[in-house]
Amino acid sequence: MVKTEVPDSIRELLPLTAAVFYILFVLAEGEKHGYAIMKEVETVSGGQFIMGPGTLYTTIQRLLELGLIEETSTSSDSERRRRFYRLSRRGRQTLEAELSRMESLVRSAQRRKLVTP
């Protein structure tokens, strides 16, 4: 991962909560609707983080307000009732900053022999 200067407006959001991290993480692959986000989070976390609808939609609302995700429109009649979300540019920068922070933490733990490389 290339080390770049993280803007203060993004740094102040770190560290991310698990719910925020996982939502940004799964949206990095492309737009998804709420239920798909919830199921993908469960999958990528290996079942270690299960997000209920209350947490999901409260967190989505907060991410929209922070400009980390955007609501997209769908042209499909069958999908019109569902709201789809995608990562914004700021959301991608925030996710990258958090991944870099986590990577640094893991390297530090490896140097201290707390985990094996």
Regions found by a protein language model. Give the residues of each.
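Short, Lys/Arg-enriched N-terminal segment that forms or immediately precedes the first helix
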Residues: 1-12
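N-terminal helix-turn-helix DNA-binding core of bacterial DNA-binding proteins
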Residues: 11-55
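Basic amphipathic alpha-helical segments that dock to polyanions
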Residues: 56-63
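Beta-hairpin "wing" of winged helix-turn-helix
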Residues: 64-81, 86
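Accessory beta->alpha helical hairpin/"wing" motif in late/C-terminal subdomains of nucleic-acid enzymes
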Residues: 87-91
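Amphipathic alpha-helical dimerization/coiled-coil segments
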Residues: 93-117
